[in-house]
UniProtKB/Swiss-Prot annotation:
Name of the protein this chain belongs to: 3-isopropylmalate dehydratase large subunit 2
Origin species: Methanopyrus kandleri (strain AV19 / DSM 6324 / JCM 9639 / NBRC 100938)
Annotated function: Catalyzes the isomerization between 2-isopropylmalate and 3-isopropylmalate, via the formation of 2-isopropylmaleate.
Transmembrane segments: none
Pfam families the record matches: Aconitase
Taxonomic superkingdom: Archaea
Biological processes per GO annotation: L-leucine biosynthetic process
Pathway: Amino-acid biosynthesis; L-leucine biosynthesis; L-leucine from 3-methyl-2-oxobutanoate: step 2/4
Subunit structure: Heterodimer of LeuC and LeuD.
Cofactor needs: [4Fe-4S] cluster
Key words, A-Z: 4Fe-4S, Amino-acid biosynthesis, Branched-chain amino acid biosynthesis, Iron, Iron-sulfur, Leucine biosynthesis, Lyase, Metal-binding
Catalysis: reaction(s): (2R,3S)-3-isopropylmalate = (2S)-2-isopropylmalate
InterPro entries, per database record: Acnase/IPM_dHydase_lsu_aba_1/3 (IPR015931), Acoase/IPM_deHydtase_lsu_aba (IPR001030), Aconitase_4Fe-4S_BS (IPR018136), Aconitase_4Fe-4S_dom (IPR036008), HAcnase/IPMdehydase_lsu_prok (IPR011826), Homoacnase/IPMdehydase_lsu (IPR006251), IPM_dehydratase_rel_enz (IPR050067), IPMI_cat (IPR033941)
Keyword hit for Oxidoreductase: no
Classification of source organism: Archaea, Methanobacteriati, Methanobacteriota, Methanomada group, Methanopyri
């Protein structure tokens, strides 16, 4: 039986396709944010053309620089808004949250849909059983112009997870463990397909898994729907990797590689100056709730640690506020930033200085990712981040939490 990716793309192309073939595909969704959108618009101008083939498919989301971090950022966004008006692009989301969160929340990404997005973490939509691919802004200019792009039909690497996670291990620890075992380029131009335990996980946890698939080189990621048609169930896979969830422990990606993954106990005692909770990886309501509860349990943050919490979307912020989490965090001295990418890309709202050591719930820890190239970033779960925020250093949650 063909893989899920082969079946979905065959339906789009109108004839059977196999992994390795190069085909032109018309997606259901063409997503741009304020970064890739600006690049796409500049490319169209350089080509001397300005046309949008399928405006009804275009989704424009401002998330990288919200609110605008500079005059240049404000001008880029204003130009994109004017472009959207000229071409009758109606799906415009300004200051509503991270693009990948909004795509899922607003139902743009859904079972069997094909999403082309101008961001490398577009595979996050695979959590909603969409087949989602990330492209650069230049490629996305041609998606606007022609309503299609060529792709190579990806092979399928299945990660089958048996058993259950044992607290305090989380989906983030599972995701980092997979990246650590596979390595940064292992799944190059593959669909990383999760089966077993991930099929029973919450949507937020599935988004975390699919989001980090990019860091193993995956072109796309996919979790089968809990209930759905047979054509969206797993088929053939080029490779199957099996993991036991009960063996997963709290881990961190140490500077400066996402795939350099180690148990938290191996780096115990590293002093921390910053903690960032948010991003398209771990900025959802449950992430913030768990972080807040643990921070309260451990009597609040260490006095030498500065904390920024960035909700992944306006809906997340609303729910945080309704549940009383926002006020609790503020009273503990935590900075709450507007929904969006925040300091994840090192542009504003909490960038790191030369000597900062940050525990981040995001997805990348390259030199300069969050500010100074001399800063160090440890990627971790909200649980590990909360313990570090309270202790002022990296501590294995298994040693602290009952």
């Amino acid at each position: 039986m063909p893989s899920v990716a082969e079946r979905i793309l065959s339906e789009k192309v109108g004839e059977p396709v196999e992994a390795g073939e190069t085909v032109y595909v018309e997606p259901d969704v063409i997503m741009l944010h304020d970064g890739s959108g600006a690049t796409a618009l500049r490319t169209l101008r350089e080509l001397g053309v300005e046309r949008v083939e399928s405006p009804e498919k275009v989704v424009l989301i401002f998330d990288h620089s919200v609110p605008p971090s500079s005059v240049e950022a404000a001008n880029r966004q204003n130009e994109l808004l004017e472009f959207a008006r000229r071409h009758r692009i109606e799906h415009v989301h300004v200051d509503e949250g991270v693009c990948h969160q909004v795509l899922v929340e607003e139902g743009y990404a859904g079972p069997g849909r094909v999403v082309f997005g101008g961001d490398s973490h577009t595979p996050t939509s695979g959590a909603a059983s969409a087949l989602a691919f990330g492209f650069g802004g230049t490629d996305m200019a041609f998606a606007l112009l022609y309503g299609e792009l060529w792709i190579r039909v990806p092979r399928t690497v299945r990660v089958h997870v048996e058993g259950e996670l044992e607290e305090p291990a989380t989906a983030k620890d599972l995701a980092l463990t997979v990246v650590g075992e596979l390595g940064a380029g292992y799944a190059d131009y593959a669909v990383l397909e999760y089966t077993g335990l991930p099929e029973r996980m919450s949507l937020g946890d599935r988004m975390c898994l699919c989001n980090l698939a990019t860091e193993a080189g995956a072109k796309s990621a996919y979790v089968p729907p809990k209930e759905g048609p047979e054509e969206l169930r797993p088929g053939d896979a080029d490779e199957v990797i099996e993991l036991d969830a009960s063996e997963v422990e709290p881990v961190v990606s140490v500077p400066h590689r996402v795939d350099d993954v180690r148990p938290v106990g191996d780096v115990q005692g590293v002093e921390v100056t910053r903690v960032f909770v948010g991003s398209c990886t771990n900025g959802r309501y449950r992430d913030v709730r768990v972080f807040t509860e643990i921070l309260e349990e451990l009597d609040g943050p260490h006095p030498d640690v500065r904390i920024v919490v960035v909700p992944a979307s306006r809906r997340v912020l609303e729910r945080m506020t309704e549940a009383g989490l926002t006020l609790k965090l503020i009273r503990m001295g935590v900075m709450i930033a507007p929904p969006g990418c925040g300091p994840c890309l090192g542009e504003h709202l909490g960038v790191l200085g030369d000597d900062d050591v940050c525990v981040s719930t995001a997805n990348r820890n390259f030199p300069g990712r969050m500010g100074s190239r001399r800063a160090e970033i440890y990627l971790a779960s909200p649980v590990t981040a909360a313990v570090a925020a309270a202790e002022g250093e990296l501590v294995d949650p298994q040693d602290v939490l009952g």
